[in-house]
Design a protein with these regions (language model features):
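Sec-dependent, cleavable N-terminal signal peptides
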Residues: 1-33
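Substrate-binding cleft of secreted/luminal carbohydrate-active enzymes
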Residues: 34-62, 84, 285-382, 386
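Structural recognition of the beta-strand scaffold that forms the well-ordered cores
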Residues: 49, 77-84, 118-123, 171-174, ...
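Alpha-helical scaffolding within the catalytic cores
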Residues: 60-69, 94-108, 154-159, 224-240, ...
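Substrate-binding cleft of extracellular glycoside hydrolase catalytic domains
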Residues: 86-220
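Glycoside hydrolase catalytic-domain groove-lining segments
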Residues: 95-122, 243-297
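Aromatic-lined carbohydrate-recognition surfaces of secreted/lumenal glycan-active proteins
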Residues: 205-233, 283-296, 322-328
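Long beta-sheet-rich domains in secretory-pathway and surface-associated proteins
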Residues: 383-490
Length: 499
């Protein structure tokens, strides 16, 4: 894991004459998150849930394929994902040269607006066009240095303009699984420097920003485990930065006997450690962008049981907002691992049925997503983004818990809650002479943030204690606040340098 400087907010108190000098780092307070992330008060009563999402292989009538799948499993997806390379449609004109809208048009022609999913584009820097100099270096991907040096800027800009012109909400999953040697854009093929990947990501993102694209959200998606597991290849080394990432995605499968060694890996074996690690590292909503399991021996190891277990455990991870099943063969190859839960359609339109013994797969999936926690709407990014990082432990935090105030003055306290499961209400309990204004007094799972503005008005000097009471079904917590009212408060800023 890359070294991340977590700078505590340093207060040093010294009594000089009749006042109190306070020494503070310039970074400011960030609730339970020490990196200065903005805390947003909770909005209207709304339980986020987890968005039901699916990868379906593109077909001639993709909209009908989505509709058929929805009917089979009893719930429409909030997100649909498919793969695309960097070739576009060289025979088209205008923006269609950079982005072929055929699949999206079949969706809009088949599904009513209310039933159309958000679209995750897994955007792979493959193929390109020799004539433009932005081309694949076979058998690898388009070389990352070529992208960074601007050889693909014309295509990237045209692609960005094409997406901007569409009405859909896009999740752009660019150059995914960059931390495994199977990936054509893994930097280990040309060296061992993940900063190259980071620079390429930021370069591509910068072009989208210049174009002014507002309907694209960026999904950074490593594999759940780095391969090789060398320190330089740690997935955190590939993180491009909070300012250019909207969602964190993950990929991980139970391959069992289709890959060596033949280990039956449950959901927690794949995802538990990495979901918690990422929640502790980045205040970003999480997506399981590729998940699937093959069949086991049918007795000790069962695919149907695996599905039920995975979907029952996913809601316990507070940052996880989307679970997206990979409803296809691995690599779209019928000779490879079969992760499907329903029949699928080949590109020629032929139906690829499930094996005769697999009737339980669809039933298990239908039952699993039938849980009301799995929704048919992807929450807005602002609602899906957690208020702070969370490293486990106490889900409730109040900061700063100690205030220095003059007799007439004010300060703002941030209150965060992460990982709770029942609706909560907040109430400030402050002593006489000190008032408080609470923004966001109703919290809904899985997280929320509020701010409490504390004011003194001709308050006598002295030491005061108060609290914020958090209550809900089966839960009652009190977060203490200490307030020292002094004649004067002198702020002295100490610049802190990250190393």
């Amino acid at each position: 894991m890359g070294i991340r400087s977590l700078l505590p907010h340093l207060w040093i108190f010294g009594l000089l004459g009749f006042g109190v000098y306070t020494w503070r780092a310039v970074e400011g307070w960030g609730g339970s998150d020490l990196d200065g992330s903005t805390l947003t008060p909770s909005g209207p009563a709304h339980v986020l849930g987890l968005a039901h999402a699916i990868h379906l292989r593109p077909t001639l009538n993709y909209g009908q394929e989505i509709l058929n799948f929805s009917n089979l499993v009893g719930k429409r997806p909030a997100v649909v994902m498919y793969f695309m390379d960097w070739q576009g449609n060289p025979n088209a004109s205008g923006l269609e040269r950079y982005f072929d809208p055929y699949l999206l048009n079949t969706i809009s022609n088949t599904l009513p607006v209310s039933a159309r999913p958000a679209v995750m584009l897994t955007w792979q820097p493959l193929h390109g066009r020799q004539a433009t100099g932005c081309a694949q270096d076979y058998p690898g991907a388009i070389p990352l240095p070529d992208i960074l040096n601007g050889k693909c800027d014309l295509y990237i800009r045209g692609f960005a303009q094409a997406l901007k012109a569409r009405p859909e909400r896009f999740l752009l999953r660019f150059a995914h699984e960059m931390n495994i040697s199977d990936s054509p854009w893994w930097v280990g093929h040309i060296g061992a420097d993940p900063s190259l990947y980071v620079a390429v990501w930021r370069h591509v993102h910068r072009i989208f920003k210049q174009v002014g694209v507002s309907n694209v959200e960026w999904v950074w998606n490593p594999n759940y485990a780095s391969n090789p597991p060398d320190p330089w290849n740690d997935l955190h080394a590939y993180y491009p930065g909070d300012d250019v990432v909207d969602w964190i995605g993950l990929s991980g499968y139970n391959w069992y006997a289709t890959r060596s060694p033949a280990i039956w890996r449950m959901f927690t074996d794949l995802y538990d450690a990495v979901l918690k690690d990422l929640a502790c590292s980045y205040p970003k909503p999480q997506i399981i962008a590729e998940i699937g399991s093959v069949e086991g021996d049918g007795a000790t190891f069962s695919k149907a049981a695996w599905i039920r277990d995975a979907y029952s455990r996913a809601p316990s991870y507070p940052f996880l907002r989307v679970v997206q099943w990979f409803n296809d063969y691995a690599y779209a190859d019928p000779r490879s691992a079969d992760f499907r839960v329903t029949t699928s359609t080949a590109q020629d339109g032929s139906v690829q049925p499930l094996p005769p013994s697999s009737g339980a797969w669809t039933s298990a999936y239908r039952d699993a997503i039938g849980n009301s926690v799995y929704t048919t709407t992807l929450p807005a990014l602002s609602a899906a983004t957690p208020p702070a990082r969370f490293c486990g432990g106490d889900p409730f935090a109040l900061a700063p818990a100690f205030l220095l105030l003059p007799p007439t003055g004010e300060a703002v306290v941030s209150i965060t809650g992460i990982g709770f499961t029942v609706p909560l209400t907040l109430a400030p309990m402050l002593p006489s002479g000190i008032s408080g204004t609470l923004q966001g007094g109703v919290w809904n799972p899985p997280w929320a943030a509020s701010s409490l503005r504390i004011q003194t008005t001709n308050t006598p000097l002295g030491f005061y204690t108060g609290s914020v009471r958090i209550q809900g079904p089966g839960l009652s917590r009190t977060l203490p606040i200490s307030i020292q009212v002094v004649s004067r408060v002198y702020p002295i800023w100490i610049p802190m340098v990250r190393r």
